[in-house]
Structures are given as structure tokens and as C-alpha cells.
Design a protein with these regions (language model features):
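Phosphate/Mg2+-binding loops and adjacent switch elements
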Residues: 1-110, 115
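C-terminal accessory "lid"/substrate-recognition subdomains
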Residues: 61-183
């Protein structure tokens, strides 16, 4: 993610540090930042904040009901009461009944804060060799072996299938895996 940000928005400082308070102070002192946007900052309670937006993946909204390492949650679901807004992602890959059940359950936890439904839409395909881009329709009817190292491989797989790619194989690596040349 860090490298993607560096490549796609190079004019915006992107700091990487497990100590979010330290990186926040650095952003303010070195770059005169007025606003800080943090990935995975919700559980860092030492941080002062003005707005907490929590993203929840509609494909696995409640993280197997357990905190890491048994599940995917970083905190108990009740912690969502601290959020100012919930963004429910991947709603395009779920049926409406499932979304309604999710929202009703979330309402029982968070009350009336905004819950925004979002979709992931593939805009283009980019070659790993030279950065050439192609329209997503290029995938239609193509035989594909796909691999990924992301938090939600099921969504990636579903995106390929929805675009008409014929999956010959699908390999999942751990989130943020650094690929070797042989892979």
C-alpha cells in the first residue's frame, strides 16, 4: 500500500511508521500538514482525532466474530460506537438481503451514525511490464491464472469473474506478501 501511494500520489507525503503518533508529529513538523489521514488508525487510541471513518468489508463484515489472531477484528465490534461514520465496502458483490441484515446489525451497535455503501469498480488493467493500461473489457473471455497478496482475495477473484475472465487457477499469498522472482 505504501508503494502504491508513493507511485500514484507522489506529491502527498506518505509516512510509514508503526508509531502513528510519531509519524503524525513528523507530518506536521516536516510537511506542515493540517490534516492527517491514517490507514488502520482507529485502534490507536493515543491519537487525537477529529473524525473516525471505519471501513467494513461487506464480504466479511464481522471478521469471523473474533479478534486477531482467531478472527480478523482488531477490536471488539462494540468499539464501533466510537466511529463517526461507517463505509460498507464491496456492496456490489453482495445481495441486497445480506446488506440489509448487515446494516441492521450495525445500527444495533452504532445507532444513527452515517453508514455509506461503497463499491469497488475496476477502472483499467495495468501491465506489470512498462505500465501499459488496457480497458477492463480486455479480460472478457481470457484464460487467467490470478494471484494476489491482499486482505480480501475473494473480492479480487470475484472481480475477475464478473469481468468475464476464465480462471484457470487462483493463488493467495499472505496480505502484503513481497513476491520473489520465482513467484
Amino acid at each position: 500500500e505504501y508503494l502504491l501511494f508513493q507511485e500514484n500520489i507522489p506529491d502527498i507525503p506518505n509516512l510509514l511508521n508503526k508509531d502513528r503518533v510519531k509519524s503524525g508529529r513528523e507530518a506536521i513538523s516536516h510537511f506542515q500538514a493540517e490534516y492527517l489521514v491514517l490507514d488502520d488508525g482507529f485502534q490507536h487510541l493515543r491519537l487525537a482525532r477529529n473524525l473516525d471513518i471505519v471501513t467494513i468489508d461487506a464480504l466479511n463484515p464481522f471478521g469471523y466474530e473474533h479478534i486477531v489472531p482467531r478472527g480478523m477484528l482488531r477490536e471488539p465490534l462494540e468499539s464501533l460506537k466510537r466511529a463517526d461514520m461507517i463505509m460498507l465496502t464491496h456492496v456490489d458483490q453482495c445481495n441486497q438481503d445480506k446488506i440489509t441484515v448487515m446494516i441492521n446489525r450495525l445500527r444495533g451497535i452504532v445507532g444513527q451514525i452515517p453508514i455509506v455503501e461503497t463499491v469497488h469498480k475496476l477502472m483499467c488493467l495495468e501491465s506489470s511490464k512498462g505500465g501499459e493500461t488496457m480497458d477492463v473489457t480486455w479480460l472478457q473471455g481470457k484464460k487467467v491464472f490470478a494471484f494476489c497478496a491482499i486482505g480480501n482475495p475473494a473480492s479480487f477473484r470475484k472481480s475477475i469473474e464478473c469481468l468475464g475472465g476464465e480462471l484457470l487457477g487462483f493463488r493467495v499469498f499472505p496480505d502484503h506478501h513481497v513476491y520473489t522472482p520465482s513467484e
